[in-house]
Amino acid sequence: CVNGIARQIQTRFLKETNNAEGTDGVHLFSHTYGCSQLGDDHINTRTMLQNMVRHPNAGAVLVIGLGCENNQVDAFRDTLGEFDPERVHFMVCQHQDDEVEAGVEQLHQLYEVMRHDKREPGKLSELKFGLECGGSDGLSGITANPMLGRFSDYVIANGGTTVLTEVPEMFGAERILMSHCRDEETFEKTVTMVNDFKQYFIAHNQPIYENPSDRKSTRLNSSH
């Protein structure tokens, strides 16, 4: 319910600041969750939003709540962990006489704090990259996957991290990952991880090697 209000705040602020001059932009991350969610669903939504607040590329953040959602702003703040109060603000719309005016004012305060931030060189060893399956097509095994494989080799060789998920899609091509393990302990962990997933499939009477298509198996086998 608060998405429309947040969009009004964003639009007005951008108009008043010449599109937030001197920054990479002001982005609105709206979503349809927060109300009527319980248990793990609620925790997952809150955790995802909190991770976005703490993201190192976020110069400043305004967290907006309507006031009646399950994902209460006070609980969100209390479970957020450490944060810079000059760069992370919170607003409950039902506590404001004019929520748009109050939100725009908060954005101006945040803007003054972060508008002069400058990029500085960093170390590759400080970065973590998540690899996402973009869907299989005719070029996956020719360009995309080999490129990500070489990219991962380069990042890891320089102390960085890449994260590869979707273990069942490794079936039939797991030996490629195993050949990249840095030591016997890592190799054994990889074997255990893959075999545990295979046993899970078997326990539920599911075929193991039919998960990746022939095309995907070929694509995986040609990647690094």
Model-derived regions: residue spans:
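Metallocofactor- and cofactor-centric catalytic cores in central/energy metabolism, strongly enriched
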Residues: 1-222
